[in-house]
């Protein structure tokens, strides 16, 4: 099974990998400069972040590189206006004095030596930051932080002369609107993940367990140099729970739908795709004794709902309108109560990012370069579940672009 899956995958040629590369130095400079312009637009003095996804986005340092602890290690990005009027980022790092050399050894993507503000163990690090000359004449700088900032650090800043506000506005949009390089990586990792599902499907056999499929699929994804980070594998009635919860010992039988939702990483970017299909040993057309009429009807219904949502992924549309387009198709067919979750979410270096596509999100306005999942589903308790998930990018003109290898074509061609 494992050899068949990997061999089938590699036989595709892995074309999706041939035009993609790790983000270079100038990509990180562009991101920080875009952030600086957004800070000016939002009236913010600096964006402050500690190691995590956002730190990685702007400086290529992940939590495994520098695990957050009780001593603050903060990146402080401020806007700086050039004589020609252009705005660029000016970045400093608040770091314990004894860790300064370690911070410099991280080889962060900066064209010059990084600028540090150091503090001793017995000092107040937040006062040290406030007393640094980077603020000029500003007495109470306005700092923006995101949801990854731990509460004790946000409180430390706000109790020591800083005005701390949450993530919003143009600053939040910087990560939401992907560059073409980012889109290239997202296309590669999501197409590669879908192709791995398609390759593995051809090797499925009667009696295999959900756990065995998950393991084989993970190793298949790794064969392309990607790093899997979650699998949902459900057979038959198990798929009526959208995110599973069973022990993975269910075995595959003729007539079972297979629902697979999987994510992987490539160059720091995430895939998140789902396919629902029949195994290769189940004939097309199905034998009448299996009574799969409703399953086939729902499979197509969910695909139609996804197509309706894609038509609403246009500039200046709302997140709510995208969800409601898919939900309306499913409700009209009488399965509204069986569509139990939101339609989707944005995706990037995290699998789940804002904005979120739910029917109550009227505030989020779609902009070119935003990337979303569309993952409608119908879950008939104790019988079966169907979900189709693809990745779409909002384009300036025309319909949103599928960057996950094309949508499913039939239960035998996922």
Predicted regions and their residues:
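Active-site neighborhoods and metal-handling regions in enzymes and metal-associated proteins
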Residues: 1-414
